[in-house]
Design a protein with these regions (language model features):
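Catalytic or ion-translocation cores adjacent to nucleophile or general acid/base/metal-coordination motifs
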Residues: 111-127, 187-232, 526
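N-terminal amphipathic/basic leader segments beginning at the initiator methionine
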Residues: 4-34
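N-terminal glycine-rich anion-binding loops that anchor highly charged ligand groups
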Residues: 37-56, 81
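Short, Gly/Pro- and small/polar-rich lid/capping loops
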Residues: 274, 278-301, 468-498
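C-terminal non-catalytic interaction/assembly regions of soluble proteins
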Residues: 307-491, 505, 510, 514, ...
């Protein structure tokens, strides 16, 4: 039975459109939101963890670069004039490692289009000059306990929302930041609009959740949804809008007439994306507790979100850094025909054997690491693969080495199998290129060592943070292991009783599961225990699995450590970001009472 539609509360509403989920997202988002969204603010998120390294390399080659150029050349060029005419203000972290360079490019575009804008720049996140002193003082990496590396490419503190709010208070039309937490571009808007104080922690948590929901673009409006076939019109999928109120409640929706799907399930999946312990979601401005968040229908493609709680933040910023750890090369070949998997496996092994001989003869050491994947044979499923003998396989071979020249020598061999070995070998696509292996490192830095600043025109001013408050423990939450009611049961795949969404943080993958009906939550908790998940995904997950509960949305969150082969650019896997982890787990068999399967809607 469908839940009744709950009317949204009345009062001032601030409408914020999430125009970009990453650097490389569609250029249609800002156009769609400005033309049909009726929004007050347009916010952009461009900075994945490793994007900063890419931007740092760009700035080393050309000092005027180092920011997300698409923000200026595509996004703003297509909407800036209309945004100014409609009074839409813009907040973006497109500044990367060169926020002032980005601001200069925006000003140049505004002049070209004949519009007047006040552009503010938030800086202070670059802590690379402090890394050596912190290393000497004994600071270590958060997860591994390793010392901070000697050579880093980038090191940036995740700033919060307060500098953005202060820039808007100063009447900026456009705010450009470097590294900040993704949700800060939304929370900063709400702190400015509603005058939320820096110690109004419940509202700060709610505003952060609103930002978290829209920070990945269409992932909140049906993108990556478990029930993908129910999501209409992918080609014109609607970008997300949050309609926010002073009390912290907000409605998630999308522009009218667009594709996509906004339901408690699609929004709930995004809540679970890339989070750890939902009672301790750490941000620079607030420690969020999302366990009791509730989501209710508020009309077609409208979901009302309430219930976020907050506590005082810590006195530290998280630093995200990247350092080079050798080089890698990855190439693909398509093998067609009889015994394709066996031919592909032998091709990969022969390439490695030949490569090692060539390295020895050229005076190079062996590869640091190698990985062969046979795409099309369910290689990601490990022991759970059930692919029928296939007659078409993509061989994906990745290797790493300490020296670029060694891999340049090896990469010349990737095309040779097309005439040397297996029949049906095709699809080489040219010689693969060698790229740096960038490892992520994270540590904490005292907030007192970092000074965020806002520059507006010729004026630069520091942003003073409120004095730290003692930490508070979250309210206790009754938990249980779940039960399996008496009576006959049936074995079904997990996807039959749950929605799923997975994400990454470094080498950790989280898998969020939402019961398809509240009555199924006890079954979900009973059947999906951490030790069972660790066993089922043991071919991928090398560390412990932790489970957390979010009863407000009838969900659990599984945090799998050492699950991504190093994660990001350090991983040799085809899925280094864990995008498929939830899909793998949703195939796990679970026992469900037959009575529930018969009584609940399909």
């Amino acid at each position: 039975m469908d839940r009744p539609v709950k009317p949204a509360p009345t009062g001032k509403v601030v409408r914020i459109g999430g125009a970009s989920g990453f650097w490389g997202d569609s250029s249609l988002g800002p156009v769609q939101l400005v033309r049909s969204g009726g929004i007050d603010y347009l916010v952009f998120d461009y900075l994945a963890e490793l994007t900063m390294s890419i931007l740092a390399g760009a700035r080393m080659r050309r000092p005027e670069e180092g920011y997300a150029v698409d923000f200026v050349t595509l996004a703003l060029r297509s909407v800036l004039k209309q945004a100014v005419e409609q009074g839409i203000r813009i907040v973006s972290n497109a500044g990367g490692v060169n926020p002032k360079g980005c601001a200069a490019a925006v000003q140049e575009l505004a002049d070209e289009l004949g519009v007047t804008v006040r552009i503010a720049v938030v800086e202070g996140d670059d802590v690379l000059p402090l890394a050596a002193a912190m290393r000497d003082a004994g600071t270590v990496e958060m997860s591994s306990g390793e010392p901070i590396p000697q050579r880093l490419v980038t090191a940036n503190a995740y700033l919060g929302a307060l500098p953005i709010a202060r820039a808007l208070d100063a009447r900026a039309d456009i705010v450009i930041t470097g590294r900040c937490v993704d949700s800060a571009v939304t929370l900063g808007v709400l702190m400015h609009e509603f005058g939320w104080a820096a110690d109004d922690f419940d509202r700060l948590a709610a505003g952060s959740l609103a930002g978290h929901i829209i920070e990945c673009g269409c992932q909140a409006t049906g993108g990556l949804h478990t029930d993908w076939a129910s999501v209409p019109d992918w080609a014109d999928i609607g970008y997300p809008i949050v309609e926010c109120r002073e009390d912290g409640s907000f409605v998630v929706t999308k522009p009218p007439g667009t594709g996509g799907l906004v339901t408690p399930a699609t929004v709930g999946e995004q809540l679970l994306y890339e989070i750890g312990d939902p009672a301790h979601y750490l941000l620079p401005d607030v420690v969020c507790d999302f366990r009791r968040v509730c989501m209710e229908p508020a009309g077609p493609h409208r979901v009302l979100v309430t219930g976020a709680r907050g506590r005082p933040p810590t006195n530290t910023y998280k630093v995200s850094a990247t350092g080079q750890a050798g080089f890698k090369v990855s190439g693909q070949l398509t093998i067609v025909g009889i015994d394709a998997p066996a031919k592909a496996r032998r091709t990969g092994e022969a390439l490695l054997e030949r490569g090692r001989r060539l390295l020895r003869e050229s005076g190079f050491a062996d590869f640091l690491a190698t990985n062969i994947e046979l795409l099309g044979t369910e290689s990601a499923y490990g022991p759970h693969a059930r692919a029928l003998p296939t007659r078409e396989v993509v061989l994906r071979l990745t290797v790493t080495h300490a020296e670029r020249r060694a891999l340049e020598r090896f990469s010349r061999e990737f095309a040779a199998p097309g005439t040397s070995w297996s029949p049906g070998t095709t699809g080489a696509g040219g010689r693969p290129s060698v790229s740096p292996v960038l490892r992520q490192f994270a540590w904490l830095i005292a907030k007192e060592r970092v000074t965020p600043t806002v520059t507006l025109g010729e004026t630069t001013f520091p942003v003073t943070l409120p004095p730290p408050q003692p930490p508070l423990a979250p309210q206790p939450l009754a938990t249980s292991q779940g039960t399996l009611p008496a009576g006959p049961s049936k074995t079904v795949p997990l996807v039959q009783i749950a929605f799923g969404r997975s994400g990454d943080k470094g080498n950790t993958s989280n898998i969020g599961l939402i019961a398809r009906h509240p009555a199924l939550l006890p079954i979900l908790k009973h059947q999906v225990m951490p030790e069972r998940v660790q066993e089922y995904l043991g071919h991928l997950v090398q560390g412990p699995v932790h489970r957390y509960e979010l009863p407000g949305i009838h969900a659990i969150n599984l945090v799998c450590e050492q699950a991504l082969g190093g994660g990001g650019m350090a991983s040799l896997r085809n899925d280094p970001l864990g995008k498929g982890m939830a899909q793998l787990l949703l195939d796990m068999p679970v026992e469900v009472p037959e009575r529930l399967l018969q009584e609940l809607p399909s």
